[in-house]
Amino acid sequence: MATHIEDVTSLLFYEDLSDVVLVGNSYAGMVITGVAAKEPRRLAHIVYFDAYVPFEGENEMSLWPPLEQTRVKAEIAKANRFRPLPPNFPAFLGISDLKLAEWVQARLTPHPISTYEDPPPLGGPESASVPRSFINCTEGPFGAPLFATFASRAWKLGWKVYELKAGHAAMLTHPRESADILLRIASG
């Protein structure tokens, strides 16, 4: 995860970007949290798009249901790797269009184990002052039950929470609706 955070913070620095609306989907909620800890002055807003919202010391795996944690830890201990994504994973994400599903499947890769085990840095008061929003995708078997937990967490933190009637890959299946919400957030 540190590499993913560094990639984004380096882009912000070397391109001298400021007033950035940084958006992260799913696992990338961990990454954007770490980016906000390291480069808060460059960010205008952070958007958790059906994404993990970690608290201090939480890694991605700690946010999964206990049975899934146990299964994955056993698999890692046995094979020192985490299972590749199943061939039907795009459908699981709510992608029913065959061409889009093939496009997504060709680009899916397993994460390094450390991305599941390392907690992101949260930063201090300056990081916490960056405005944040959450987009809650309400349909589909993958995201809806898990990420609704983080929509609730965001709401309790006082963030603006938007609902999108789409699956976890809404930016691909519902691009116009996704863009409309992001533009509303960016315009304040």
Q: Language-model segments: which ranges?
A:
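Conserved loop-alpha-helix segment in the C-terminal half of the alpha/beta-hydrolase fold
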Residues: 138-172, 177-180, 184-185
